Design a protein with these regions (language model features):
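Active-site-proximal binding-pocket segments
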Residues: 121
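C-terminal catalytic core of Y-nucleophile DNA break-rejoin enzymes
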Residues: 59, 63, 125-145, 153-176, ...
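Short glycine-/small-residue-rich flexible loop motifs, especially phosphate/cofactor-binding loops
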Residues: 32, 90, 173
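Feature representing long, continuous alpha-helical segments
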Residues: 71, 75, 87, 101-105, ...
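A short, basic/aromatic helix-end/turn motif that makes direct DNA contacts
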Residues: 105-111, 188-189
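Basic, Lys/Arg- and aromatic-enriched nucleic-acid-binding interface segment
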Residues: 2-27, 37-106, 114, 125-129, ...
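Hydrophobic recognition helices of helix-based DNA-binding modules
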Residues: 31-35, 143-146
Length: 189
């Protein structure tokens, strides 16, 4: 109904306004800290406003937790008629538990298949620490199959626009959406 749509739009605008206010306060704080460091002011007056803004309500990422639904998702991925690169990314994701950007940007040089591990360099990680991902037998099988398609390139999942860059994390998400899993049901994060 039209009333419901307007209520949802109003809620989204309010959430965006709160988010914008928090970002503006953060920017002001950075400006004042720079001004202090360069001798232009003595204190950060933006710090006085911390706690004055309504907190941003963070919503948990949607995920499937029901075992039967997880099984259905995995079957849908196996049956998905995407190209082999996208399908491999979707198939590998449940075995490695990394962020979509880390998966999409994975490079062959980061993998030691004999040791069954993926060593994600610190500069690629959100916390800037080396992250070692153990690889299961199933993950190794997916990687061996994938090597036929992208083993000659830098990236496991090269972009369809050229091998010199990886596919985007949005590409993985778009594949889930095409399979019918919208953002309220499943995210790749």
């Amino acid at each position: 109904p039209a009333g419901h749509k307007k209520a949802v739009q109003a809620a989204n605008r309010a959430r965006e306004a709160i988010d914008t206010a928090h970002r503006a306060l953060q920017s002001c704080g950075q400006i004042f800290r720079y001004a202090i460091a360069t001798g232009r002011t003595e204190r950060d007056v933006a710090a006085d406003l911390r706690g004055a803004l309504v907190p941003v309500k963070r919503k948990a990422f949607a995920t499937i937790t029901d075992p039967a639904a997880i099984g259905a998702l995995l079957r849908d991925i196996d049956a998905y008629s995407a190209g082999p690169i996208t399908r491999a990314a979707l198939r590998l994701a449940p075995y490695v538990f990394v962020r979509p950007g880390e998966l999409a940007g994975a490079e062959w040089k980061e993998f030691n298949l004999e040791a069954a591990e993926w060593r994600i360099p610190a500069h690629k990680m959100k916390k800037r620490e080396l992250h070692i991902v153990p690889l299961s037998r199933q993950a190794l099988e997916i990687l061996e199959d994938l090597r036929l398609y992208s083993g000659h390139t830098r990236f496991l999942f090269p972009s369809n626009r050229g091998n010199s860059r990886p596919m985007t994390k949005e590409g993985i998400l778009a594949a889930l959406r095409r399979m019918g899993y919208d953002k309220d049901v499943m995210t790749t994060h």
